[in-house]
């Protein structure tokens, strides 16, 4: 029986699809501007970023498509919007670097994971270059080979 890999205690959610679809060139850490009910829902583990992406407007970065499912008990006086646009908190130089790469070099900016840092929610974003179909196949083939190699070593030790 295979063991389930445990996610780190401070990790909220991860975008596994992004590492399959893109070559990640560089990563950045960004804060998220959240409302109170969103923080409460994130603590309950109700956040997903698999369909999320990042866009730039007026020298600011925004996270689109991140889904935070509201809790029934926490948002009684507010009408929650589960897929609203959330502002990413980055330094001006980081925003300029990301914006320049996305506009000129054909890169994409994707969210990789969200995690707790002290009591703040942080989002790890990556400057990514899209993979072609043959690159994806090669990645899967290499991963399978590494897995088979490890199995072979374990059988030899037993």
Curated annotation (Swiss-Prot):
Matching entries from Pfam families are given as:
SmpB
Please note every region of biased composition (Basic and acidic residues): 141-158
Residue span of region Disordered = 135-158
User: Which segment of the chain is annotated as a signal peptide?
Assistant: none
Q: Which GO terms describe its biological process?
A: trans-translation
Which HAMAP family does this one have?
A: SmpB (MF_00023)
Q: Which PANTHER family match?
A: SSRA-BINDING PROTEIN (PTHR30308:SF2), TMRNA-BINDING COMPONENT OF TRANS-TRANSLATION TAGGING COMPLEX (PTHR30308)
Q: Which protein, by its recorded name, is this?
A: SsrA-binding protein
UniProt lineage: Bacteria, Pseudomonadati, Pseudomonadota, Gammaproteobacteria, Moraxellales
């Amino acid at each position: 029986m295979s063991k389930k890999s445990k996610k780190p205690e401070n990790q909220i959610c991860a975008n596994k699809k992004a590492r399959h679809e893109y070559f990640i060139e560089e990563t950045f850490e960004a804060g998220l501007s959240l409302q109170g009910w969103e923080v409460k829902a994130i603590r309950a583990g109700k956040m997903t970023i698999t369909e999320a992406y990042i866009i730039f407007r007026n020298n600011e970065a925004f996270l689109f498509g991140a889904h935070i499912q509201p809790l029934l008990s926490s948002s009684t006086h507010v009408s929650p919007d589960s897929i609203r646009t959330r502002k990413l908190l980055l330094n001006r130089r980081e925003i300029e670097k990301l914006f320049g790469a996305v506009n000129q070099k054909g890169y994409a900016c994707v969210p990789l994971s969200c995690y707790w840092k002290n009591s703040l929610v942080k989002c790890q974003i990556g400057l990514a270059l899209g993979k072609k179909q043959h690159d994806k196949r090669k990645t899967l083939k290499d991963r399978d080979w590494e897995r088979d190699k490890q199995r072979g070593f374990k059988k030899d030790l037993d």
